[in-house]
Amino acid sequence: MKISRREALSISAATLAGLSLSKLTLNGQQAVAQTADQSDWPSELVERPLRNGFPAPLPLNADGSAPEHPESAAGPISDPLMWRSQGRQTPQIEFDYRQMQIKVDTRGFANKTGTLHFSDLQQLPIRSHTFLLQCGAPNPRGIVKWTGVRFSDFADMLGLIPEAHYCRFIASDRFYIDESVQTLRHPQVMLVWLMNDEPIPPQHGAPLRLIIPFRYGNRSIKAITEMTFSTPGPRMPPLPA
């Protein structure tokens, strides 16, 4: 079906008007919410109690690394589990690590980009380590045996160059973290798919989870769906003396 230029302009104007009205309504709702929030906000600095039990102790070695525990100490992770989704429920995705398809966007900072499969990780040295997973609050908490690969080996497989300074991980519930590549290359940082010698359960982050044992648990992001590498800018050349 063909339409005239006049009709097209009319449709465009109506569409823009609708979008403007929608935006205005949304902004109006936000303004009401902001006004309500601000009306309850203290007009000066006031004393408030600290969060109960926060932060929980996170034992570390003198060099900042995480203590490694014997496999015999491994066990479950305590509740409550944290998901940022409807009803705090585990989002429905493909949980079988053998079927994982994870977007890896290296943005020109590596030789490889595209979709990560389990067969790619199988080419790397597979390792197991037993670490404490500790939330910033007293729970969730647990000593767990994790099996997977070092993130540094994964980065080398991609051919990541030094000018890639950060990686953003996005989870199935759209929670995300940004972490420096320098931190991710620490030998204790892992991409894991087994928990206590079994596939990671959906509620604990199947099919693939990041483990940073020397940070609180929310940095060990669950159910990775995307990884994007970026940089604030290439490193400066040495300055003249």
What are the residue ranges of the model-derived segments?
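N-terminal secretory signal peptides and thylakoid transit peptides that target proteins
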Residues: 1-19
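Short, hydrophobic/aromatic alpha-helical segments in well-folded domains
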Residues: 11, 150-154, 196
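Near-N-terminal "mature-domain entry" segment
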Residues: 21-153, 157, 213, 219-241
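Detector for glycine-centered tight turns/loop "hinges" at secondary-structure junctions
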Residues: 109-111, 174-176, 197-198
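Surface-exposed patches in mature extracellular/periplasmic domains of secreted proteins
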Residues: 162-170
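A contiguous pocket-lining binding segment that forms or flanks enzyme active sites
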Residues: 175-185, 189-193
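A recognition module on extended beta-rich or small alphabeta surfaces enriched in W/G with H and D/E
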Residues: 188-221, 227-230
